[in-house]
Amino acid sequence: HKEYRRQRQMCIRDRDLKAEVETVDVAGGYELPAALRMAMKARRRWDGYLLLGCVVKGETDHYTFICEAICKGVMDISVESGAPIGFGLLTVDSLAQAEARSRPDRMNKGAEAAHALVAQIALARGWGLA
């Protein structure tokens, strides 16, 4: 969470956005699409949604099914709703790979997803949609 919050603040500052952010934890990656749908149905409205997660491969094919289900669920909601969504799901073989893809000083897939979300929100605002 600490790195996520740092990246979020950088994105807001870089774009000079007036942003209010709420962080929600879910049980696991598989729950991301359902949590996204719930957030979109909530009384409170947000300009965009950032989903971050990590699935580490085990010894069975379960990993493949879970990753595909998460990605399909998020994509279906994205296409259906048209809402700005940043999506950073690490699909890795080990914790070391996850750490390498979430380093604050180099490659950071969460930061990339956050920057993509900020760009999508700016696009939606430019078209009067957010």
What are these language model-derived features?
Residues 26, 53-55, 90-95:
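Short, ordered loop/turn segments at secondary-structure junctions
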Residues 64-91:
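Short, acidic/small-residue loops that bind anionic groups at enzyme active sites
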Residues 34-74, 130:
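Glycine-rich phosphate-binding loop
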Residues 15-25:
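Short beta-strand elements in bilobed, periplasmic/extracellular small-molecule ligand-binding domains
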Residues 1-12:
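Single conserved hydrophobic/aromatic residue that forms the stacking wall/gate
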Residues 93-108:
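Phosphate-binding/catalytic loops
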Residues 107-130:
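A charged, well-structured terminal subsegment
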